[in-house]
């Protein structure tokens, strides 16, 4: 395995984790619908207990996503997570209050009341997808940072990456296209949440409400996602093919055309997303939409992240100094580290198999009102 192959391999793994994270944010999407789909306290508890079975998957994937970046591309980790820390801290805090809300909303002695923690779940459901989408958009639109590897010999301040302003990541929200992708991810999370609830909860009224609301949320998703995708394909990108970082017209479109297998996967992903939404919005009884739209989401997001870094592309552009932009080559770990981790990564299929087994065991029976009343529940 060459060094270049290892860099591309680990970018694929990080991108796959990011794609899975977007799919698993159906938990956040469903939580934004607690009061829209649940008209009584019993119905709201059904929704919360449905997502409560899966929130650990989302949180663990988020942490693993960050850990994989730290291990394979440490300069990105120190630049983005260390420089844009306000953005990432808000995201992390929203996930922490989610965990607390699940565990404490119906505990004895909860003087704040269940509704307070339900509102916290809604906050996480909005903030998490919105800001994560905005953070991912910076892979294409850039951020405000500087890299000076010469500082490594500075005994007083051996810091090679620094943020160029005091906002430390919040400036990403000043770029309207970052916000557009954030809103697209939020609407996609809501769609996935509805599809998951249709599949997981045995309750006629809730399923009917999901079916009615799906088309409107799908329309809003397309209104945000399609303009972002079209702009992405025609905008300038950041190429490293000449040895230095240069601007290349329609770089991301060129990446798809030069790697046609990614273009095919992208088209399949988009079709699956739309098929799952269409079928689910046409019938209250149809419950398999989560799998079509979920798989389509993973494929689509995977391709978008791959074209951000593969084919001699700077995946984290600097808007302050073009040559400070991060690439797979200038931000990765050593060849020995990547090679060793690649061997360990061969265990990933076994981990995925365990996750599938655990998922099937948890969802062997759909949630019903009787189960909430008789068993242990959130």
Sequence positions of predicted segments:
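Short, membrane-exposed interhelical loops at transmembrane-helix boundaries
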Residues: 247-250, 316-337
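Juxtamembrane interface elements at the cytosolic ends of transmembrane helices
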Residues: 22-35, 96-110, 144-152, 183-204, ...
């Amino acid at each position: 395995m060459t060094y270049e192959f290892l860099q591309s391999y680990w970018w694929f793994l990080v991108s796959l984790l990011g794609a899975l994270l977007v799919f698993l944010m159906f938990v956040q999407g469903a939580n934004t619908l607690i009061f829209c789909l649940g008209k009584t306290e019993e119905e709201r508890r059904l929704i919360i207990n449905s997502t409560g079975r899966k929130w650990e998957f989302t949180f663990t994937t988020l942490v693993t996503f960050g850990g994989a970046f730290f291990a394979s591309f440490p300069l990105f980790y120190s630049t983005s997570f260390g420089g844009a820390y306000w953005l990432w801290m808000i995201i992390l805090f929203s996930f922490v209050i989610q965990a607390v809300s699940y565990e404490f909303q119906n505990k004895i002695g909860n003087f704040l009341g269940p509704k307070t923690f339900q509102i916290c779940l809604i906050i996480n459901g909005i903030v998490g997808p919105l800001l994560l989408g905005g953070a991912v958009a910076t892979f294409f639109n850039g951020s405000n940072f500087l890299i000076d590897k010469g500082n490594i010999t500075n005994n007083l301040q051996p810091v090679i990456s620094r943020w160029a302003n005091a906002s430390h990541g919040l400036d990403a929200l000043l770029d309207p296209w970052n916000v557009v992708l954030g809103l697209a991810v939020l609407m996609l999370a809501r769609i996935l949440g509805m599809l998951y609830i249709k599949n997981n909860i045995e309750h006629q009224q809730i399923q009917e409400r999901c079916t009615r609301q799906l088309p409107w949320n799908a329309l809003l998703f397309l209104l945000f996602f399609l303009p972002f995708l079209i702009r992405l394909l025609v905008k300038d990108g950041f190429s490293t093919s000449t040895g230095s970082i240069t601007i290349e017209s329609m770089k991301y479109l060129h990446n798809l055309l030069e790697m046609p297998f990614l273009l095919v996967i992208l088209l399949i992903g988009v079709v699956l997303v739309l098929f799952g939404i269409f079928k689910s919005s046409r019938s209250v009884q149809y419950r398999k939409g989560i799998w079509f739209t979920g798989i389509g989401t993973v494929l689509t997001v995977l391709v978008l992240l791959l074209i951000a870094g593969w084919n001699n592309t700077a995946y984290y552009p600097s808007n302050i100094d073009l040559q400070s932009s991060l690439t797979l080559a200038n931000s990765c770990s050593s060849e020995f580290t990547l090679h060793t981790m690649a061997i360990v990564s061969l265990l990933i299929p076994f981990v995925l198999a365990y996750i599938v087994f655990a998922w099937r065991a948890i969802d062997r029976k759909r949630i019903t009102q009787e189960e909430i009343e008789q068993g242990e529940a959130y």
